[in-house]
Amino acid sequence: MEVRHNWTVAEVKALLDKPFMDLLFEAQQVHRLHHPHNHVQVSTLLSIKTGACPEDCKYCPQSAHYRTDVDKERLMEVERVLDAAQKAKNSGSTRFCMGAAWKNPKERDMPLLKEMIRGVKDMGLETCMTLGMLTPDQAQQLAQAGLDYYNHNLDTSPEFYGNIITTRTYQDRLDTLSHVRDAGMKICSGGIIGMGESTNDRAGLLVELANLPTHPESVPINMLVKVKGTPLEQVDDVEPFDFVRLIAVARIMMPKSAVRLSAGREKMNEQMQALCFMAGANSIFYGCKLLTTPNPAEDSDMLLFKKLGINREQVAQKPDEITENELLDRVVERVAARPTASDLFYDAAL
């Protein structure tokens, strides 16, 4: 299938309007052309600096503009971040994402951020950060420290964007994505469904993502988590089939990207999640929280994977992490595979 960067809103709406079964069938066909089937990549997300964000994103409980139950916390110590990363690896995550509630990182924070990146990389995990807007120099610094992915969502269509955020422009977001790409990092960028946007806006979001010069390597699709105290706490729920349709169309439009089920998965039953995987989702966040919102427990995810026959992407194991029992097993295997005396010599008496 041709990878395109010239989609129109009309084309995307036509896909969204297809019969549900036909759309899922097409999305699954596209998915299997570009990705291992029955395979999901697992990430863990940690809030390394929580609350008191100067931005006015109407969906976000971390905004200083709204009264929510989120407490203000300073930038987390490097040791605590690395401890959380090790626990994430032990639980099966292959990527560790670190998020800070900032408009943009300050230069005084860059040394600590780079230390976090290097420490997580040393564990054999992929690294991702979401810190707000970046300058070209900051993007270069993070890339040189070894950051693999940078997350910066577009959130919604350009037309609906002003109804949700006024403290940074849509172009600000696109500029940050450009700086990230120029620095050689991979892009994680998606949006949020259920903020009161129209079908046109949902189509417009996917058009913006798919028409970037290079598709994002990871496309998180979030279902709004309504939080008391935010302006969007009373919006209508997303129709589950509409959400699954969006996953399917994202897969068709960006066939080589990972499509991630992100915020809102806690509200999805197993059947809805299964449909999302059928539609082409092949990545999830794993663990108890996504920044400040709940996420399904690890045990429930593993049970669902078992029911569906889904395999997790495995963490690359470093030589010094091989356990004594694993080493013994390997020795036994090698000894068993060695030729015996009867294999090497014939018995002249026979």
From Swiss-Prot:
It is an enzyme of class 2 (transferase). One of its GO terms (molecular function) is 4 iron, 4 sulfur cluster binding. GO terms for biological process: biotin biosynthetic process. Catalyzes the conversion of dethiobiotin (DTB) to biotin by the insertion of a sulfur atom into dethiobiotin via a radical-based mechanism. InterPro entries: Aldolase_TIM, BATS_dom, Biotin_synth/BioAB, Biotin_synthase, Elp3/MiaA/NifB-like_rSAM, rSAM. PANTHER family: BIOTIN SYNTHASE, BIOTIN SYNTHASE, MITOCHONDRIAL. Homodimer. It catalyses: (4R,5S)-dethiobiotin + (sulfur carrier)-SH + 2 reduced [2Fe-2S]-[ferredoxin] + 2 S-adenosyl-L-methionine = (sulfur carrier)-H + biotin + 2 5'-deoxyadenosine + 2 L-methionine + 2 oxidized [2Fe-2S]-[ferredoxin]. The keyword Iron-sulfur applies. Gene3D superfamilies: Aldolase class I (3.20.20.70). Disulfide bonds: none annotated. [4Fe-4S] cluster binds at C53, C57, C60. Keywords: 2Fe-2S, 4Fe-4S, Biotin biosynthesis, Iron, Iron-sulfur, Metal-binding, S-adenosyl-L-methionine, Transferase. The keyword Protease does not apply. It comes from Vibrio cholerae serotype O1 (strain ATCC 39315 / El Tor Inaba N16961). Residues 38-256 form the Radical SAM core domain. Binds 1 [4Fe-4S] cluster. The cluster is coordinated with 3 cysteines and an exchangeable S-adenosyl-L-methionine. [2Fe-2S] cluster binds at C97, C128, C188, R260. Its EC number is 2.8.1.6. NCBIfam families: bioB. This is Biotin synthase. Belongs to the radical SAM superfamily. Biotin synthase family. Its cofactor is [4Fe-4S] cluster; [2Fe-2S] cluster. PROSITE patterns: RADICAL_SAM. Pathway: Cofactor biosynthesis; biotin biosynthesis; biotin from 7,8-diaminononanoate: step 2/2.
